[in-house]
Regions:
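Short, charge-dense linear interaction motifs
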Residues: 1-219
């Protein structure tokens, strides 16, 4: 039975975000389904028009999800008892727009969205276009880390490493998103409509970490 050494290598990559993704949610509620649907659609149209007017392409705003559910509200009757009463159909569009993380782009997009009158819920995330390169860099560093540790331990024991016997790796690939948060209360939307009030942000780098386990023969 050959002597072996098994080492877990850890690799990291520190990546600067180059892509901004804005996720929006707009909707409308009405007891008449057609009215609810039309009102929600009008908000989407207003968003597209505002973003196009700000210089973004006509197909920049994409629909990621459309849903319809029913809403009920608690009504107290004359006897003091509560009952559920139909409040209407709630039609909701979930949308995304992504663009390069360059000076002025975020400010331009938020200003356009805020001035559209659609009053969407907004979340902003900072990520990267080329995720493959980020994962590859982390994996390469993990392999180098494992080999360096194996060579150090073998040398300290008066031996050296030989043939690579096995590699054990679980491909987990977490989302590559900067920890920087961009939060905006609904009350701030009218203020954000003024371009001068929207700050440009330099987000924190994205830290990618991965691990791989290697087994070598000891000679």
């Amino acid at each position: 039975m050959p002597r072996t050494i098994t080492i877990k290598g850890t690799g990291r990559a520190d990546i600067k975000p180059d892509l901004i993704i804005i996720r929006l949610s707009v909707g409308s509620t009405d007891k008449n389904y057609e009215k609810a649907s039309d009102a929600a659609s009008e908000r989407v149209t207003a968003l597209k028009a505002a973003l196009t007017g700000a210089g973004f392409s006509e197909d920049a705003l994409r629909t990621s999800d459309f849903g319809v559910d029913t809403r009920y509200e608690s009504i107290r009757d004359k006897d003091g008892n509560y009952r559920q009463e139909f409040a209407g159909y709630n039609c909701v569009y979930r949308l995304t727009i992504s663009f390069a993380s360059e000076p002025g782009n975020l400010s331009r997009a938020i200003s356009a969205i805020s001035s559209s009158g659609a009053e969407p819920e907004i979340s902003v995330s900072f990520t990267i276009k080329d995720t493959t390169s980020a994962y590859t860099e982390a994996l390469t560093n993990a392999a180098m880390n494992a080999r360096a540790k194996a060579e150090t331990l073998a040398s300290a024991s008066g031996a050296s490493i030989g043939t690579l016997i096995s590699i054990d790796y679980s491909d987990r690939r977490p989302d590559l998103v900067s920890p920087t948060n961009f939060r905006m209360a609904d009350e701030a939307m009218p203020l954000m409509a003024a371009k001068c009030t929207v700050p440009d942000i330099t987000p924190e780098n994205i830290n990618v970490t991965d691990t791989v386990t290697f087994t070598w023969e000891i000679i």
